[in-house]
Amino acid sequence: MAKGILGRKIGMTQVFDEKGSLIPITIVDVSDNVILQQNSVEKNGYLSTQLGFSSKREKLSTKPALGHFKNAKTSPKRFIKEIRFLPGIKNELSELDLGTSLKTNLFQPGDIVDVIGISKGKGFSGSIKRHNQSEGPKSHGSRYHRRPGSMGPIKGKIKGKKLPGQMGHQTVTLQNLKINSIDHEQELFLIKGSIPGPRKGFVMIKTAIKTVIKENQDA
């Protein structure tokens, strides 16, 4: 069944399983999740649930935003995202009332999830670092070392051409990650492997889309 929650990446650690194998773990704080809005196919044309995460001071919000939070009877939130659901597929969030707090028991250890976040920004980078292209000769007399080389005779710009430019700071989705364990007391998810973004970066955790589609086909 489809579901999702917002969180903040705390950092990485490691644990050992019963066989003594080392497992890299990312810790995600999922406390303070509140439902802000419900969108339906009849009214909005698509099915989704809007969530808010991480409270902030009222003076940091605009008046329209404060009215939006007031409708949900909650404090202003720093990170707001919509989790969209495929029509005809059951989900656990659409029937919940506005202002409902989501807890860690929404997911269970062993669940397979997709994690969406903003990758670390690397600034302006050359094509060798950005696209893993080969370097030129390093010997004396060579005309280029790390330049991108000829762009070809085609006139104008070509979309998707591998050139120097902004690297990182893009929305990245990692699929089929496993929730290794859950700390219900501190409201933490321990996810196997790494996830996008720096420490303290916001992420969205959803039931793996491939799992949802497979369950729907089997049903």
Curated annotation (Swiss-Prot):
Subunit and partners: Part of the 50S ribosomal subunit. Forms a cluster with proteins L14 and L19.
Classification lineage: Bacteria, Bacillati, Mycoplasmatota, Mollicutes, Acholeplasmatales
Gene encoding the protein: rplC
UniProt xrefs under InterPro entries: Ribosomal_uL3, Ribosomal_uL3_bac/org-type, Ribosomal_uL3_CS, Transl_B-barrel_sf
Gene Ontology CC terms: cytosolic large ribosomal subunit
GO molecular function terms noted in the UniProt entry: rRNA binding; structural constituent of ribosome
Family: Belongs to the universal ribosomal protein uL3 family.
Role according to the record: One of the primary rRNA binding proteins, it binds directly near the 3'-end of the 23S rRNA, where it nucleates assembly of the 50S subunit.
UniProt name for this protein: Large ribosomal subunit protein uL3
PANTHER family: 50S RIBOSOMAL PROTEIN L3 (PTHR11229), LARGE RIBOSOMAL SUBUNIT PROTEIN UL3C (PTHR11229:SF16)
Keywords: Ribonucleoprotein, Ribosomal protein, RNA-binding, rRNA-binding
Presence of keyword Secreted: no
Keyword rRNA-binding (UniProt): yes
Region described as Disordered: 124-154
